[in-house]
Amino acid sequence: MLVSYNWVKEFFQDFPLTAEELGEAITRTGIEIEGVEELSASLKNVVVGEVLSCERHPDAEKLNKCLVQTDETEPVQIICGAPNVAAGQKVIVAKVGARLPGGLKIKRAKLRGEVSEGMICSLAELGFESKVVPKAYAEGIYVLPAHVETGVSAITLLGLDDAILDMAITPNRADALSMNGVAHEVGAIIHQKPAQPTEPDVSEKGKADDFISVEVENPAETPYYAIKMVENIEIKESPLWLQTKLMKAGIRPHNNVVDVTNYINLLYGQPLHSFDYDKIGSKKIVVRSAKEQEEITTLDGEKRTLQAGHTVITNGVEPIAIAGVMGGEFSEVTENTTTVALEGAIFSSSSIGKASRELYLRTEASIRYDKGSDAWKVEKALAHGGALIAELSGGTLVGGVVEVDNREKAVNKIETSLTRINRILGTAITLAEIETIFDRLGFVLEVKNDALIIEVPTRRWDITIEADILEEVARIYGYDEIPVTLPATSTTGGLSDSQKARRVMRAYLEGAGLNQALTYSLTSKKDATRLALSDEKTVALSMPMSEEHSHLRTSIVPQLIRSASYNIARKNMDVALYEMGTVFYATEGDNLPIEQEHLAGLITGNWHTIDWQKTPKPVDFFVLKGIVEGLVNKLGIKSELHWKQTEKEELHPGRTASLILEGQEIGYLGALHPAVEANYDLKETYVFEINVAALLDATKEKVVYHPIPRYPEMTRDLALLVDKNTDHATISQVIQEHGGKLLVDIELFDIFEGESIGENKKSLAYTLTFLDSERTLVEEDVQKATNKVIEALQEKLHAIIR
């Protein structure tokens, strides 16, 4: 948020800090200031001038020869190329010797033979970004109001004798997304109470009920909705003070109605929206959920398709605004507007955030609703906005508001103690200091024996538990004032067995070709239950930052799927990821959730083997199966890993297996269901997820080291035809049992099914590797072992050797 230093000072009678000092003080209390920009640092000798005459340059069609009065001396001639310059205008003039942003220094010059003694400036030439310059002046100079005195400093007039603090507001401090909120924060720092904003004293006439009525269909999504009416208005430019406040905050001025809604949003952090009353087409506003595929053209001219669940403002028939996000073009305020219906509302932060993300439409209003707002300041903001519109437009403020109020006000009281504060913070704060701290914060403190009971104002809705109170004490007391203490004991370094095992797993998976991923533990309600190993209940956050991060995950795989989709959308087509992280399951009552460590992986695209001579091949079930089996072997687990075909929602019904270790199901491995792959624009994709605790707790074999073989190995390829229902594990077991001590490795390299070999048959091809560590093998040794394997396969599995 861009904060004007001069605007902050307006809240206080005596302000003791410079802009730089204020930035440092705010940063020390927990809100980072990313930068402080002095707007006038590169400006000098810029004044208000009056264009006395304006005529075309004799030798340049696009240039104008202007006679400009800048002070009490003789007027000067200035050559200007702006298309909107005209006689009688009050303009911004950089005199000879002036300095402008970018190091530009104004000198007396000749342009096409005519002398130019200065420069008539646009706002962009004074340092304003083009996106905040009013559209009427986007292609030319800025024209000042006619009443402005000639010769005065344009730097002061435009509020450029100011500094802008760029505040990085964290999600929990949305109260600071307003000047009023910033003023409270600054007041706590400088030991002063900020003045509260006051609306203009405007008389009211008539009743708002005579103009419109309001109906809210879902009070949970819209706890409060109100309309304030202003009639007989004249749409025109806002006064200079309002335009400059908006531009310095990064907002483009439009007109005296829209600018007031943006100003109130900045001042209170409460979004308002203005409807052209005559365009609504009804005397009734209905707030409801959008219908699936319902459409609205928003103020930016885009036609948007809504989803069920988006909250919309309607005239009883069709949407006129997307609640909390953006108004509709249908009811836009224009230069012909004479009556305004001004909306002030409280919407569900989760629903507004969800709509904003799904529509890819992020606005100043949606940002504030998404992060949360003070539900009890909306009436004051609406009253201020209505009165200011009436004052600036010469309109009539209609009496009363039309409202639907379903808010429930609860006093937020939190209890702690002085002893607990000092013990946790490591301080020796006195009760008197605590009382001063809470007074500076504007919190009400009640002392009962040893207990401190703090009543938190509604503007600080982020404070809900004792830890929040302790943080506030630490912030205002000063983090740099908290004594540094050393640990009471020392510990010896070293890794536990489980830490060593985790390092082995990571090293093995990375060596196998997978890249480590780190994804959020927070996910949406929908994703929280997908592809979980357990059917336990999910854990919901009490104060989620957004709907997309409202639950703790029960599986890592959904986040890996999103990561793969993100990579493929950016043309990284071959993705191999793994993550070792925590999943969470709910427990009964208010007990802490169960935390389990899981290992998950994903491969999609082509698989690149280590051998440079082999070409990449599409991923398949057996690539990932081999990696998982290799991981189990690497950990030295004594028991064999068994595979059992299974079915799991969102996985392919014919390519999914559960992993069985020591008689316990510890995970799953399978291909994503084609519908899931299509939803994320993925090609064939395989995933696995394993309970890490089961791997760590499994019985391990003793590590035995063998010398590197001195003698060469020999291989034999074996292709066999077996019944379609015979699985690879059974075949591998028979080969292992009858291959003898010389057989050191079995690799399946081909599977074939088709009409040419029979309907209920399949062909599997294996490479058998033989090795003797004591001598060089001869053909007779290998053939003898191979024959035993063939005989066993024929006898036990009725295999046909091809």
UniProtKB/Swiss-Prot annotation:
It is an enzyme of class 6 (ligase). The keyword Methyltransferase does not apply. It is found in: Cytoplasm. Its EC number is 6.1.1.20. One of its GO terms (biological process) is phenylalanyl-tRNA aminoacylation. Tetramer of two alpha and two beta subunits. HAMAP family: Phe_tRNA_synth_beta1. This is Phenylalanine--tRNA ligase beta subunit. It comes from Listeria monocytogenes serotype 4b (strain F2365). The gene is pheT.
